Swiss-Prot record:
Entry EC no(s): 6.1.1.14
Record keywords, A-Z: Aminoacyl-tRNA synthetase, ATP-binding, Cytoplasm, Ligase, Nucleotide-binding, Protein biosynthesis
Xref: Pfam families: tRNA_synt_2f
Name assigned to this protein: Glycine--tRNA ligase beta subunit
Main location, first listed in the record: cytoplasm
Family: Belongs to the class-II aminoacyl-tRNA synthetase family.
Enzyme class, broadest EC rank: ligase
GO MF terms held by the record: ATP binding; glycine-tRNA ligase activity
């Protein structure tokens, strides 16, 4: 079996483009090979700012032969009344390169059609790769791509060389004005000269010799080891940041870490501002002491080795000093204007053209947050109102204008400096949480209520003016907001009706809506339902989720409890036959029968047996459902399996006598409604 190696050498590709490009290369090539009937063992991709590469192991030298069936016209079109081929059949056969006499008939759902079966001899794999690889290079998707020179091709950055080898032999093709070959290049600054490549193993060896580490995982490990070493040498510990670690690994080809310092005077600026300035603007790692306090130092990753890093360090320190000086200036200037005064300035900030100013938005979600406090924790209502009033004030501060990432954090810091209540100050920062899937949630009810209210106003407002997420676009991060609300509700165990909260939000937005409120409400609730189902399906079997949600999900905590109970109930030894029996009950009664069961109408002992069993568990099951003890309720309902099976074996439910039929349906309705309070068993795969 043979090996394919491909390297695309470029000018510096943005770090954020590279991981996705590597994944896309693998997926695109796998699809191309599959379509070409070329088997392989595995594909491995590599990437640096100046090169994207891949290798494929276990390739054959020749594509396997294939028997291809092509469908032609319908039988009555291909043959006349006497069974002779028509011109349509002759033309089809000619187009397929077969004799008309070799055409066969194939039965389909639409009737009989003629078909041509032809054998296709396998082609040499290198010949096929010469067609596949230029398509692969052309089809790698980037957020932004560019043309260069007068060429009619696009890529993330201009391509300077291409290495393409099959079993050590060049796979010849051209992309733009670049012909594939065997020549790669080393590090731009440390070994910027060409070198030949024989195969993938040789490529890795030569890259190392030319100061390039093409494997991003290996670069990350080197960086991780280096930054921990440097932090320890500086007398501290690294502040972990896996996101930054991944990013800087795609900013270099041969990483080395150096330590720099800044004046301890800057530590008077809030910690988050310093970290943000170093991380987001300079890609520096922060250092903390044994107590977790920020130290006046940083670690930066170079793309080169230097015998004397002093010059590099001084340059980095100079740039950071300017950044931190700006931050200190804004921090000091912002304190001259109180947050309450800044709230008035929100009247001049447009939140969204159709939804009004940030001040209007604040008034809306402040009312929602106060309502949540009334419902869930009245003792904190005053603090909730104050936190909601102040939580957007820092948007018009100089610091947030310069460092948008610290919105909320600066509001908290300024509130504390002004002597605001500590819980209110904390909630100002917490109301932005969670900022990402699986992220930190608000710790306090105050922060949770303001966070939920702000996000619900955003969702209802955007849906209300037609700004609804699509499969590819969600500019207002509505999916993240909905998941944030759901996770807060589940984490805190808040028992509330989501439908009622949506009604309140839409009522506050009434003057802004451009769509009927009833339509907006339906869309918003379905949006939440979809996010909730997806979240639960990550933790439980999808059919259990669908079954429980079908029984209602206005109260998310209750729905989650029913899902968990149903998932655990799957371990019951009789689960599958129980599910089948319960499905049958549900299918027969459909809407149910609102009539008391009359034992005088029983005609078979099985009816009495089932009625006694139902009456024996009904009260206990209702009590358990009322208290949310769903697993215990299901376990008790499971005792009905035997009587239900006997009932169906011996009793004709749909009796001719209407009174008997109705009575039997009423008996089954009692079971169906006990089950229906927990889940719709018709959704269970059994």
């Amino acid at each position: 079996m043979k090996e394919l190696f491909l390297e695309i050498g470029t000018e510096e590709i943005p770090a954020g483009f590279i991981p996705k490009a590597m994944a896309d290369m693998e997926a695109l090539l796998a699809k191309e090979l599959e379509n070409a009937r070329i088997s392989f063992d595995d594909i491995r991709t590599l990437g640096t700012p100046r090169r994207l590469a891949l290798t494929v192991k276990g390739l054959p030298t020749v594509q396997p032969d294939a028997e291809i069936t092509a469908m032609g016209p319908a039988r009555n079109v291909a043959f006349d009344a006497e069974g002779k081929p028509t011109r349509a059949a002759e033309g089809f056969a000619r187009g397929q390169g077969v004799d008309v006499a070799s055409l066969t008939l194939v039965a389909t759902e639409k009737g009989e059609y003629v078909a041509a079966v032809r054998k296709e001899s396998g082609r040499p794999v290198p010949e096929l790769l010469a067609e596949i690889l230029p398509r692969l290079v052309a089809n790698i998707p980037f957020r932004k791509s560019m043309r260069w020179g007068a060429l009619d091709v696009r890529f993330a950055r201009p391509i300077h060389w291409i290495v393409a080898l099959f079993d050590g032999v060049v796979v010849p093709f051209t992309f733009g004005n670049i012909e594939s070959g065997t020549i790669s290049r080393g590090h731009r600054f440390m070994a910027n000269q060409p070198f030949p490549v024989r195969d993938f193993a040789h490529y890795l060896e030569e890259c190392e010799r030319h100061f390039v580490i093409p494997d991003p995982e290996r670069r990350q490990e080197i960086i991780r080891r280096e930054i921990h070493r440097v932090a320890k040498a500086a007398g501290g510990h690294l502040l972990p940041d896996e996101g930054l670690l991944e990013e800087v690994s795609f900013l270099c080809e041969y990483p080395s870490a150096v330590h720099g310092t800044f004046s301890a005077e800057f530590l008077k600026v809030p910690r988050e501002v310093l970290i943000t300035s170093m991380r987001s603007h300079q890609r520096y790692f922060s250092i903390v002491d044994d107590a977790g306090k920020l130290m006046p130092g940083f670690i930066t990753i170079n793309n080169t080795l230097t015998e004397d890093p002093t010059v590099v360090v001084k340059g980095n320190e100079r740039v950071l000093r300017a950044r931190l000086s700006d931050a200190r200036f804004f921090f000091e200037e912002d304190q001259k204007v109180k947050l309450e005064t800044r709230v008035e300035s929100l009247k001049n900030v447009v939140y969204q053209q159709k939804l009004g100013t940030s001040f209007e938005k604040m008034e809306r979600f402040r009312a929602l947050a106060e309502g949540l406090a009334d419902l869930l924790n009245p003792a904190v209502k005053v603090k909730v109102s104050q936190a909601a009033f102040l939580c957007k004030a820092d948007l018009v501060s100089g610091m947030v204008g310069e460092f948008p990432e610290v919105q909320g954090i600066m509001g908290r810091e300024y509130a504390l400096i002004e002597g605001e209540d500590a819980e209110v100050a904390a909630a100002i920062a917490e109301h932005y949480l969670p900022t990402q899937a699986g992220g930190e949630l608000p710790a306090s009810d105050i922060g949770a209520f303001v966070s939920m209210a702000d996000k619900l106003d955003t969702i209802c407002g955007c849906f209300g003016v037609g700004l609804i997420p699509t499969g590819s676009a969600d500019p207002y991060a509505l999916r993240r907001s909905a998941l944030g609300i759901i996770n807060i509700i589940l984490d805190k165990g808040y028992r509330l009706s989501l439908e009622e909260q949506v009604d309140k939000a839409l009522g506050l937005l009434a003057a802004k809506l451009t769509r009927p409120a009833v339509d907006v409400k339906a869309d918003v609730l379905e949006f939440f339902r979809g996010r909730f189902v997806n979240l639960m399906a990550d933790r439980h079997a999808s059919d259990a989720v669908d079954a429980a949600v079908a029984a209602g999900c206005a109260d998310l905590v209750d729905a989650a409890a029913r899902i968990a109970a149903l998932s655990e109930f799957r371990s019951h030894p009789d689960f599958e036959p129980l599910a089948v029996a319960f499905k049958r009950v549900g299918n027969i009664v459909k809407e149910g029968v609102d009539a008391p069961v009359d034992t005088a109408l029983f005609q078979d002992a099985a009816e009495g047996l089932l009625n006694d069993a139902v009456q024996g568990v009904a009260v206990s099951v209702r009590e358990k459902i009322a208290t949310g003890a769903y697993l215990e309720a299901l376990t008790e309902i499971a005792a009905l399996r035997g009587p239900v099976d006997t009932f169906f074996d011996k009793v004709m439910v749909m009796a001719e006598d209407e009174r008997v039929r109705t009575n039997r349906l009423a008996l089954l309705t009692g079971i169906a409604r006990m089950l229906g309070a927990i889940a719709d068993f018709a959704k269970i795969a059994a």
